């Protein structure tokens, strides 16, 4: 039986993805239905992460048009925010703190694979709402992009897409992606993918946030429209 308090939370807590309210086994399905488009592309020179900027209330009302859905979590890594705003921000704070603690104790940065694995452990065991982020970064082994599902599964790929705009964005990337492409080309492709998703997906829109990740660090920029990002 559905709890009225949960219904109230569902309706009024801002989301950058989904806030689950029933069977936890349906978390990933719900994330895909209710909002946001996040894209991660790896190249030989680094990683590009792109997201839209829209947050919604209950998936029906646009509550914010300037959300930064990408955060730096490591000297050479970033992660997207997907889920309720509070849950996603708490998740990133916890992950960033663990990565910093590791670096202090070991006097070396966490590898991107270990960082993604830690994110998966947090997603599975923590009190976070439908976390389905992308982790992208660069380490001694090269460029990496991982998707983390709500059950804690961690998968590495050359590129990945999460959120309700997944099908449209993936279709845009599929025929044009090449691991040997330049960072500039990957940036343009990521922008086109998010823009295409925003044209058809009501949960995505209002510009784009871009993160460019190399072995020198992370640079994050936000744009109100797709033309100015190109």
Curated annotation (Swiss-Prot):
GO terms for molecular function: threonine-type endopeptidase activity. InterPro entries: Ntn_hydrolases_N (IPR029055), Pept_T1A_Psome_bsu_arc (IPR019983), Pept_T1A_subB (IPR000243), Proteasome_sua/b (IPR001353), Proteasome_suB-type (IPR023333). Belongs to the peptidase T1B family. It comes from the Archaea. Residues 1-10 have a biased composition (Basic and acidic residues). GO terms for cellular component: cytoplasm; proteasome core complex, beta-subunit complex. Component of the proteasome core, a large protease complex with broad specificity involved in protein degradation. Keywords: Autocatalytic cleavage, Cytoplasm, Hydrolase, Protease, Proteasome, Threonine protease, Zymogen. GO terms for biological process: proteasomal protein catabolic process. The active site is at 36 (nucleophile). The 20S proteasome core is composed of 14 alpha and 14 beta subunits that assemble into four stacked heptameric rings, resulting in a barrel-shaped structure. The two inner rings, each composed of seven catalytic beta subunits, are sandwiched by two outer rings, each composed of seven alpha subunits. The catalytic chamber with the active sites is on the inside of the barrel. Has a gated structure, the ends of the cylinder being occluded by the N-termini of the alpha-subunits. Is capped at one or both ends by the proteasome regulatory ATPase, PAN. Signal peptide: none annotated. This is Proteasome subunit beta 2. Residues 1-29 are annotated as: Disordered. The formation of the proteasomal ATPase PAN-20S proteasome complex, via the docking of the C-termini of PAN into the intersubunit pockets in the alpha-rings, triggers opening of the gate for substrate entry. Interconversion between the open-gate and close-gate conformations leads to a dynamic regulation of the 20S proteasome proteolysis activity. The gene is psmB2. Its EC number is 3.4.25.1. It catalyses: Cleavage of peptide bonds with very broad specificity. It is an enzyme of class 3 (hydrolase).
């Amino acid at each position: 039986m559905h709890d009225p308090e949960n219904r109230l939370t569902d309706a009024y807590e801002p989301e950058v993805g989904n806030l689950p309210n029933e069977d936890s086994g349906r978390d990933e399905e719900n994330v895909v239905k209710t909002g946001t488009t996040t894209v991660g592309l790896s190249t030989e020179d680094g990683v590009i992460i792109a997201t839209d900027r829209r947050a919604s209330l209950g998936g029906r009302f646009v509550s914010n048009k300037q959300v930064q859905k990408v955060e730096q979590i490591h000297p050479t890594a970033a992660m997207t925010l997907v889920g309720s705003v509070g849950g996603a921000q708490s998740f990133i704070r916890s992950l960033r703190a663990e990565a910093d603690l590791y670096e202090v104790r070991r006097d070396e940065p966490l590898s991107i694979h270990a960082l993604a694995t830690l994110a998966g452990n947090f997603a599975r065991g923590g009190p976070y709402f439908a976390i389905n982020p992308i982790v992208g970064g660069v380490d001694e082994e090269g460029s990496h992009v991982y998707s983390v599902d709500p059950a804690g599964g961690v998968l590495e790929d050359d590129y990945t897409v999460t959120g309700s705009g997944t099908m449209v964005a993936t279709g845009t990337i599929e025929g044009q992606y090449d691991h040997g492409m330049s960072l500039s080309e990957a940036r343009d492709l990521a922008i086109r993918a998010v823009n295409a998703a925003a044209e058809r997906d009501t949960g995505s829109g209002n510009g784009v946030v871009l993160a460019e990740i190399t072995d020198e660090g992370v640079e994050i920029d936000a744009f109100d429209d797709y033309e100015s990002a190109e």
